Amino acid sequence: MKRARIIYNPTSGREIFKKHLAQVLQKFEQAGYETSTHATTCAGDATHAAKEAALREFDLIIAAGGDGTINEVVNGLAPLDNRPTLGVIPVGTTNDFARALGIPREDILKAADTVINGVARPIDIGQVNGQYFINIAGGGRLTELTYDVPSKLKTMLGQLAYYLKGMEMLPSLRPTEVEIEYDGKLFQGEIMLFLVTLTNSVGGFEKLAPDSSLNDGMFDLMILKKANLAEFIRVATMALRGEHINDQHIIYTKANRVKVNVSEKMQLNLDGEYGGMLPGEFVNLYRHIHVVMPKEKAEQLDD
């Protein structure tokens, strides 16, 4: 019998997963999985639980939570030689990674069905400073809002909490001097932010990295150069439509490796969570983890 381990964050997404847990377990049992669960209790717990489950040779590990929970599970699996297949049940606020995979984000039971009936494909992940990420890494004051927003506010307001925090931060945004090397090229200058992405879905923007691929061995690198408040707002508005990539303030390109040096303190954002401080070198790990996705999405990757 196949064995599945569900690692879930009991506080994610208005604490809704706990209410559906019995039904989710029933679905997996009916699909032929011997299924057990682990409820996370603190930061880093999902990483430890994922590593432990992998060493116990579970066939499938399901991360049920937000992008931060998925990131922790990936960090438990990525360093191992034998990595179980990863399934995702999105229960967070933004759910960027699930959006990129085409996994239902509004219905936990439909997401569970996708994990059961979907297809596993190997996808790229990123590594920087000994840590792993599966969706996005970045730096710049605005990228910090994803972990500056209190958990209780996210639980109450959902995505709106991020918009409110972003509006609050806008007047205080200022550029930072950086040096960014990417595949033999060099950018030196002041930036508002930079993003190293693996999917097209970033911070709820579905077209921020429109050329991204889950399995091409390349990051999408986006650099927003120094801009005043009006220019910044204009670029952000264009980003909703994916039209920002041709703007004069934007560098948008593909890269397998990205090295960032900073002249002043800059925090590192990994999948929406605090990832320490820069500098850092971002390395793309080609098709490193098998992830379950809808059959239609898998067919797109196969083309």
Swiss-Prot record:
It catalyses: a 1,2-diacyl-sn-glycerol + ATP = a 1,2-diacyl-sn-glycero-3-phosphate + ADP + H(+); 1,2-di-(9Z-octadecenoyl)-sn-glycerol + ATP = 1,2-di-(9Z-octadecenoyl)-sn-glycero-3-phosphate + ADP + H(+). NCBIfam families: PRK13055.1 (NF009603), PRK13337.1 (NF009874), YegS/Rv2252/BmrU family lipid kinase (TIGR00147). This is Diacylglycerol kinase. Binds 1 Mg(2+) ion per subunit. This ion appears to have a structural role and is required for catalytic activity. The lineage of its organism: Bacteria, Bacillati, Bacillota, Bacilli, Bacillales. The keyword Flavoprotein does not apply. Its cofactor is Mg(2+). It is an enzyme of class 2 (transferase). It comes from Bacillus subtilis (strain 168). InterPro entries: ATP-NAD_kinase_N, Diacylglycerol/lipid_kinase, Diacylglycerol_kinase_cat_dom, Lipid_Phosphate_FormReg, NAD/diacylglycerol_kinase_sf, YegS/DAGK_C. Mg(2+) binds at S213, D216, M218. The keyword Magnesium applies. SUPFAM superfamilies: NAD kinase/diacylglycerol kinase-like (SSF111331). One of its GO terms (molecular function) is ATP-dependent diacylglycerol kinase activity. Belongs to the diacylglycerol/lipid kinase family. Keywords: ATP-binding, Kinase, Lipid biosynthesis, Lipid metabolism, Magnesium, Metal-binding, Nucleotide-binding, Phospholipid biosynthesis, Phospholipid metabolism, Transferase. Residues 1-132 form the DAGKc domain.
